[in-house]
């Protein structure tokens, strides 16, 4: 089930939603391509579909979505092996996962490849897809929550 979740998340997040739909049709130019940073394209806010980019556009960040997918996958796998790990190893795994996620996002913005909103929304969309996939793929055999008294 875990590997099905990981595969589905990679296919639906970075694969389908980000690269096949948003980056292909949103048309938002990358920071290095807009006039404010020496390029020739006009800046457009993240919520506006544009014609300022023809292919491999800025919205949303593929690396941001991929790094969030990797982070969620790592956390799910860590949770699966939690009873076999020491508490320190488990926390270290969580911390390293968070550092990787933040590093990738910061690197994409610092390099001029994406606006901060591109990265934050890629993380958000990917997390939402993971939340939708979790119930049928990860939580289906979980016991129901205890009633609140």
Segments predicted by a language model, with ranges:
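Interfacial segments of alpha-helical transmembrane regions
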Residues: 1-24, 90, 94
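Short, well-ordered alpha-helical segments in soluble proteins
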Residues: 16, 26-29, 78
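Basic side chains
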Residues: 23, 28-30, 108
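Membrane-interface interhelical connector segments
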Residues: 27-53
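Membrane-embedded catalytic cores of phosphoryl/pyrophosphoryl-handling enzymes
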Residues: 43-149
């Amino acid at each position: 089930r875990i590997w099905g979740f990981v595969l589905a998340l990679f296919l639906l997040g970075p694969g389908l939603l980000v690269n096949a739909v948003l980056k292909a049709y949103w048309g938002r130019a990358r920071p290095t391509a807009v006039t404010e940073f020496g390029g020739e394209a006009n800046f457009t806010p993240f919520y506006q579909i544009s014609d300022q980019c023809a292919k491999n556009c800025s919205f949303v960040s593929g690396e941001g979505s991929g790094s969030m997918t990797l982070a969620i996958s790592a956390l799910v796998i860590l949770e699966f092996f939690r009873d076999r790990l020491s508490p320190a190893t488990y926390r270290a795994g969580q911390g390293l996962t968070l550092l990787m996620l933040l590093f990738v996002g910061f690197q994409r913005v610092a390099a001029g490849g994406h606006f901060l909103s591109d990265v934050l929304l890629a993380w958000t969309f990917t997390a939402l897809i993971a939340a939708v996939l979790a119930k049928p793929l990860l939580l289906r055999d979980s016991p129901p929550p205890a009633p609140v008294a």
